[in-house]
Amino acid sequence: MARIEGIDLPRDKRIVIGLTYIYGIGNTSAQKILAEAGVSEDVRVRDLTPDQEDKIRAVVDGYKTEGDLRREVSLNIKLLQEIGSYRGMRHRRGLPVRGQHTKNNARTRKGKKVSIAGRKK
């Protein structure tokens, strides 16, 4: 099982799909990484040679992935909250950030409805 950036890639999948298991690498990034490393997209993870694994690791090291990327995203959100921007306020209140309406929907972001006990008409 190939291990890249601390993630065990699934053995039975093609390498282009296996790379997407790493946080911060999607389909397009995976294709670019493999092209730069000179590895075919159709190779299964179990069929990679150690040399190919090393080439892929070297290319992936140039990308911001996993812990570094998660840390950067959380710091960006924290900065928005500290400077008091509208987006920061929406993050702090747990509401949608990108201008969506919240009168009817936004349940995913707002969480489960909270009933008000003892309230009758």
Swiss-Prot record:
Any Gene Ontology CC annotation: cytosol
Alphabetized GO MF terms: rRNA binding; structural constituent of ribosome; tRNA binding
UniProt key word Coiled coil: no
InterPro entries: Rbsml_uS13_C, Ribosomal_uS13, Ribosomal_uS13-like_H2TH, Ribosomal_uS13_bac-type, Ribosomal_uS13_CS
Keyword Chloroplast: no
Keywords: Ribonucleoprotein, Ribosomal protein, RNA-binding, rRNA-binding, tRNA-binding
One Gene Ontology biological process: translation
PROSITE patterns, A to Z: RIBOSOMAL_S13_1 (PS00646), RIBOSOMAL_S13_2 (PS50159)
Pfam families for the chain: Ribosomal_S13
Gene3D superfamilies from the UniProt entry: 1.10.8.50, 30s ribosomal protein s13, domain 2
Region described as Disordered: spans on this chain: 90-121
Record-stated family: Belongs to the universal ribosomal protein uS13 family.
Listed NCBIfam families: uS13_bact
PANTHER family: 30S RIBOSOMAL PROTEIN S13/40S RIBOSOMAL PROTEIN S18 (PTHR10871), SMALL RIBOSOMAL SUBUNIT PROTEIN US13M (PTHR10871:SF1)
Assembly mode: Part of the 30S ribosomal subunit. Forms a loose heterodimer with protein S19. Forms two bridges to the 50S subunit in the 70S ribosome.
Cited function: Located at the top of the head of the 30S subunit, it contacts several helices of the 16S rRNA. In the 70S ribosome it contacts the 23S rRNA (bridge B1a) and protein L5 of the 50S subunit (bridge B1b), connecting the 2 subunits; these bridges are implicated in subunit movement. Contacts the tRNAs in the A and P-sites.
Protein name: Small ribosomal subunit protein uS13
Organism: Lactiplantibacillus plantarum (strain ATCC BAA-793 / NCIMB 8826 / WCFS1) (Lactobacillus plantarum)
